[in-house]
């Protein structure tokens, strides 16, 4: 299934705002409204993506709870989880670490004293996106298994 944004015609007025503002989280988004190749759409308020949930502020808890999210899928590495872990009472968490290829390569470049130019950055990002798919098939399969078995809204996130 390929997700594409709805066209820009007037009929695309959304019933909800895609960006959901929180004081501590800067990039919490509703993925509802995206259309698949066969014309079906992702339902609003059932699938969210976010940056670190560890930054959710106490004042944000009520708004977060109103969304009804009961499951989080945490794509962060073990080191990232240790640096900024979270515990939200109403949330069951599935940890599916996806190590970004670009991080390992950048560390190697720094160790070797190499500099990063625009062309190399573009190449690294392309390789990273390929590696996400090639190296993390089990994690993505588990991700979709969770999505298909949940009867409440789900949020997935990485560090950002």
Regions found by a protein language model. Name each.
Residues 1-155:
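Cys-dependent protein tyrosine phosphatase-like superfamily
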Residues 159-160:
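Basic (Lys/Arg-enriched) interaction patch that binds polyanionic ligands
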């Amino acid at each position: 299934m390929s997700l594409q944004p709805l066209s820009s015609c007037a009929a695309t007025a959304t019933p909800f705002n895609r960006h959901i503002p929180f004081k501590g989280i800067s990039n919490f988004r509703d993925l509802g409204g995206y259309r698949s190749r066969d014309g079906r759409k992702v339902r609003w308020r059932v699938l969210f993506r976010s940056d670190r949930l560890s930054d959710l502020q106490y004042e944000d808890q009520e708004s977060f709870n109103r969304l009804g999210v009961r499951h989080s899928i945490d794509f962060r590495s073990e080191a990232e989880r240790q640096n900024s872990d979270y515990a939200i009472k109403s949330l069951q968490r599935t940890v599916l670490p996806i190590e970004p290829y670009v991080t390992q390569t950048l560390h190697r470049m720094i160790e070797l004293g190499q500099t990063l130019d625009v062309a190399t950055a573009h190449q690294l990002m392309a390789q990273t996106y390929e590696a996400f798919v090639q190296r993390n098939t089990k994690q993505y399969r588990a991700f979709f298994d969770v999505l298909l078995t949940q009867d409440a809204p789900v949020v997935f996130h990485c560090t950002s």
